[in-house]
Amino acid sequence: MPGQPQAAPFLTFDVRSMDVTETGAISLVPYTIIPRNTPFKVSTEFAFGGGFATWLVSLGLTWFAKFYVESIGPGYEGELGSSTGATVAGQVSYGLPTTAVSVAGIANPGTYKLTCAITIGTGAVGPPSPIAGFVEGPMIQIT
């Protein structure tokens, strides 16, 4: 999903995808159907583009990713987990390390929508830079 900025050919920022995987044993059910009390992991990918992308990532900027869940109907809504890291010189595409999620907050079976917000900043203190992106991920069903 296009993020901000979208100033081609100078600088673009895109959050490309969001994935869900179950932890533990291999299962024949899709990763979007998760038994209650079974932990799962979420991850996402994002990329910089344009002529200034290589210069920007060389600054070692900190990225912040927060994963959220929203029930479809009554149920739990809130933050699932977060991840942080830093940009690396010469690397414009990033696949986040998976973030383990405890489903303790998701007590009710039901259908839930996952989302992720990524902001790029100069550190944990202070406002983020005007680089941000969002992705609505897959729907999951807690059974």
Which residues does each PLM region occupy?
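Solvent-exposed serine/threonine-rich low-complexity stretches and specific carbohydrate-binding patches
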Residues: G75-Q91
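Short amphipathic, basic-aromatic surface patches that mediate peripheral association
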Residues: E45-S58
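Internal, hydrophobic beta-strand segments that form the core of beta-sheet-rich folds
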Residues: F40-E45, L61-E70, G95-Q141
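Eukaryotic short linear interaction motifs
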Residues: G51-A53, P74-Y76, G123
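"Short basic amphipathic alpha-helical interaction patches in structured regions
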Residues: V57-L61, G81-T84
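Short beta-strand elements
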Residues: P2-D19, S83-V88, S102, G121-T143
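Short beta-strand segments of immunoglobulin-like
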Residues: L28-I33
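Solvent-exposed, conformationally flexible loop/turn segments
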Residues: T23, R36-N37, A89-Q91
